[in-house]
Curated annotation (Swiss-Prot):
Lineage: Bacteria, Bacillati, Bacillota, Bacilli, Bacillales
Annotated function: DNA-binding global transcriptional regulator which is involved in the adaptive response to starvation and acts by directly or indirectly controlling the expression of numerous genes in response to nutrient availability. During rapid exponential growth, CodY is highly active and represses genes whose products allow adaptation to nutrient depletion.
NCBIfam families registered for this protein in UniProt: codY_Gpos, PRK04158.1
Keyword Transferase: no
Region (GAF domain): 1-155
Broad class of where this protein is predominantly found: cytoplasm
Name of protein: Global transcriptional regulator CodY
Highest taxon of the lineage: Bacteria
Subcellular location: Cytoplasm
Length: 256
């Protein structure tokens, strides 16, 4: 397969995900297919965003790492110290992705590391490993292109997260501001009663304890639910199950 064909295969994957978040496991699988390598896509804090492993699955340590979804802190730090592409790293180098304890199995292995950059900052690392055969110039071009694409996707996800947080905060603020004084007081007592972000509420019990009518509680919950801040489900005589849908709601409630 030519370099152009391999590049197009990566582009095809991205076009399939246009407008939605890319699954980095799919990206890792595609990179593995076109480069014939073991692949790790790692965040700057060592979280495994995506991987596609073949020979490396023979190592129990690698299997444990995949279960934890994190690479060791020491290796993360070593990767972050790599400022530009480093290719054809052998098994005796501390940057090798292959487990040194299996040195005899991976004696001819080669590791290549591509820093993932975007928006003027380091976002993570693309690590490719081959059991044998050096990485050639075409491999390096493809790897650097893949790292650039991954960086763009990570930035897009970050941007989407910031936008979602802003929308959630606006919805929470509007919902809290729509409450009357007594309704806000009722909500504060409800979550004090629940002791967390979800639980079973008996409205009459809270109403009697606080000295407000049950209708105030019902109206307050209805306003929050219509704003998408909470969800509630009646369980009949048992009460009402309540769950917070917006993570920052309780923090914002305390501030108001």
């Amino acid at each position: 397969m030519s370099l152009l064909s391999k590049t197009r295969e990566l582009n095809t994957l991205l076009q399939k995900h246009k407008g939605i978040a890319v699954d980095f496991k799919d990206v890792a699988q595609t990179i593995s297919n076109v480069t014939v390598t073991n692949v790790f896509i790692v965040s700057r804090r060592g979280k495994i965003l995506g991987s596609c492993l073949n020979e490396l699955l023979k190592s129990e340590r690698i299997k444990d790492m995949l279960e934890d979804r994190h690479i060791p802190r020491e290796y993360t730090e070593e990767l972050m110290n790599v400022k530009q592409t480093e290719s054809n790293i052998d098994i005796d180098n501390e940057l090798t992705v292959f487990p040194p304890e299996n040195r005899e199995v991976f004696l001819n292995s080669r590791t290549t590391i591509f820093p993932i950059l975007g928006g003027g900052e380091r976002l993570g690392t693309l690590v490719l490993g081959r059991v044998q055969d050096d990485f050639n110039e075409n491999d390096l071009v493809l790897g650097e292109y893949a790292a650039t694409v991954i960086g763009m996707e990570i930035l897009r996800e970050k941007h989407n997260e910031v936008e979602k947080e802003a929308r959630d905060k606006a919805a929470i603020t509007m919902a809290i501001n729509s409450l009357s004084y007594s309704e806000k007081e009722a909500i504060e007592h409800i979550f004090e009663e629940l002791g967390g972000t979800e639980g079973l509420l008996i409205a009459s019990k809270v109403a009697d304890r606080v000295g407000i009518t049950r209708s105030v509680i019902v109206n307050a919950l209805r306003k929050l639910e219509s704003a998408g801040v909470i969800e509630s489900r009646s369980l009949g005589m048992k009460g009402t199950f309540i769950k917070v849908k917006k993570d920052k709601f309780l923090d914002e409630l305390e501030k108001k």
